[in-house]
Amino acid sequence: MFLADHPFADRSNSTSNTLGTDNPWANQIVPFNACAFFVTSRPTRHYLLSIALLLLLPEFIWGNEATKPAPSYANGAPVDSNGVFTNDKGDIAHGSASVRVPFMLRRFGTYLRSDKGAPEQIQDAAAQLQANIQAGQPAVTWVGHSTTLVQIDGINFLTDPIWSKRPSPVPLLGPRRYVAPGITLEDLPVIDFVVISHNHYDHLDLPTLVALAKKNPQTVFFVPMGNGKLLRENGITEVVELDWGQTTAYKNLTVHCLPSQHWSKRTLTDTNKTLWASWAVTGGERRVYYAGDSGYFPGFTEIGRQLGPFDLVIVPIGAYAPRAMMLESHMNPEEAFDAASDLGASKALGVHFGTFDLSDEPLAEPPQRFLNTGSSATAAAPTPWIFKIGETRSF
């Protein structure tokens, strides 16, 4: 693929060294204060503001009904007639109001929801990781949610790192974290680079990214088109933006920016103005694919044909219920296993479940269904992997 013109993104693949603004959180969300203008009582104003925040939070994770016209594009990631990114099939549906409104109301109850079924956490995670580092084996560690630490060819990289307690524009609100990160930031090895799939708060966690950049200023952050501005404005300097179909070298590895079927939104006014993506990292030692967030789509087969087979495929298996709302943007466990098969995976690691309360399915359901699907598959199918939080395995 070649690059396509896009009004919201500088479609270059060079590393930017532009420093951010004086305020490290300058671009965080502040669209909720309108109601406060009309309220003079401070307690009442705070109460109404809290209610508004709670009602609007789901919009930053699950979005709204697709209304944009069919895509018009030639090269790179599709761009629709409104000048925003879209998918190969056009805009994806997010369910009718009759599905979405009850779903959002149910999210209020999750503040009291039990953590029964949340993933177990191993007790010796740091020691296990350190032992593997000393052994020098290709390995993957599940930190939690979609965050993994991958070690291949002497390189350490992270996928969608989030160490925050809540994926939210407001630290005290949003889905709570059931299980702490399996590895502390302090126990991480030197991180060479990070891949970000899209700008939703459970995947692009600014506090974590800033902390990683401060810990090692040489860490490179690979992001889909349009996402670099937010990082640079928060003081992260080593940022590389890529379009679908673009590749770049990192030492002895090749980093591939690839399609996924999803969407983006971080404020009330920026829907699909930044790109979403999946990633492949290939080298002489191992080939790894990270799906990010995605509905099941034909692109998996094409990626597998062009770049597979993969030694490890990391696929999201949670946040799929209700299906009327999630079908086109989040795979269920069976679809995730099929995607790994399409990609030519040897090992398929299920992630994106059990860490945050994002959807209606029981916390323990995604890994059970994923393993059940794998156990009934043919011998040539991928081996399904479900980790405890903090677990490391070589591959």
Features from the language model and the residues they span:
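Intrinsic-disorder-associated, low-complexity terminal segments enriched in Asp/Asn/His/Tyr and depleted
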Residues: 5-6, 10-13, 17, 22-23, ...
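Metallo-beta-lactamase
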Residues: 23, 27, 31, 46-50, 116-135, 224-286, 369-391, ...
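Cap/insert and terminal regions of metallo-dependent hydrolase folds
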Residues: 59, 64-67, 73-80, 87-88, ...
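Active-site metal-binding motif and surrounding structural segment of the metallo-beta-lactamase
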Residues: 77, 100, 173-223, 238, ...
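Catalytic core of the metallo-beta-lactamase
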Residues: 148-151, 249-311, 327, 331-334
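Acidic/histidine-rich helix-loop elements
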Residues: 161-180, 263-271, 321-330, 357
